[in-house]
Design a protein with these regions (language model features):
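A compositional/biophysical signature of low hydrophobicity enriched in polar/charged and small residues
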Residues: 1-154
Length: 154
């Protein structure tokens, strides 16, 4: 919905869109934050348009689940590393998809080899580096370029 995509709408604008009082919108947002339905607010940055070096990696991680705790305990150990931006339990050929950001491939490689791979339950890792982002969180990151070339006809 439009509300989900445009989370920076003012309470007044949300109230108008939903045809309810502003206090009702404010109270509902506060309740959803308390209940952890709304978990945070994020700014989406296209790092390619800045002078800052930023590299995103996705790491496939195979683990051995721990008795009585399944995947939850190892997931917690992984997501508590400050470098880690996201951890997902996956179906298919591996167990977790770990997303992290760093300045260089070496920095990410060092994290994987010195912190992630040595964890007790980790069986293997495969690292993929993002070369270019075209769309992120529903937002196209590059403006369409108009082809200004003229057609040549014989």
């Amino acid at each position: 919905s439009d509300v989900y995509k445009r989370q920076r709408l003012a309470i007044h604008d949300l109230a108008v869109m939903l045809d309810v009082a502003e206090t009702e919108v404010a109270n509902e947002i506060a309740d959803m934050e308390k209940e952890h339905i709304i978990c945070g607010y994020h700014t989406l940055i296209n790092w390619d348009n800045t002078s800052k070096d930023q590299l995103t990696a996705m790491i496939e991680v195979k683990v051995t689940p721990q008795r009585g705790q399944g995947f939850d305990r190892i997931a917690e150990r992984i997501y508590n590393f400050p470098e880690v931006k996201a951890v997902y339990l996956m179906s298919g050929g591996y167990d977790f998809m770990v997303m992290l950001e760093g300045k260089t491939m070496k920095e990410i490689s060092m994290f994987t080899s010195s912190k992630l791979a040595p964890l007790e339950s980790v069986v293997s890792t495969v690292t993929h580096f993002v070369l270019k982002k075209y769309k992120d969180h529903g937002t196209v990151l590059e403006a369409k370029k108009v082809d200004e070339r003229q057609a040549v006809t014989p």
